[in-house]
Amino acid sequence: MNFKRKVYSRLLEWKEKYSDKYAVLLEGARRVGKSTIAQSFGENEYDSCILIDFSKATANILECFDDIANLNIFFLRLQAETGITLYEHKSLIIFDEVQLFPKARQAIKHLVADGRYSYLETGSLISIKKNVKDILLDTPIF
């Protein structure tokens, strides 16, 4: 329980100080509660939260990442597919098990630079490094 409180307080610090400039990555072993903490944080600290679990994502969700040149369309498609409304500067988008879908990892810098929403990623660091070794990352790791 103490671990979860510590992570949650670090996420609050990230939200307050860095979420407009950086995504955050929660990394760790499988089944330690990363997804649960991420979802709880999104539900409690933001007006809305979209969780994309790449271990279960539909083909339609994955297709959203095929062309992110037009972010207006990208965000409209995400909202349509999830049924969740995004609010600028008040919504969190969670990429869960991000190591399973490198296109999302590639897109994160572009999405953060857009500045409309906050981004939290979860995954196994070993798997992330293996699957995205050629992608430049600009994400603090907690």
Regions found by a protein language model. Give the residues of each.
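Phosphate-binding site recognition
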Residues: 1-142
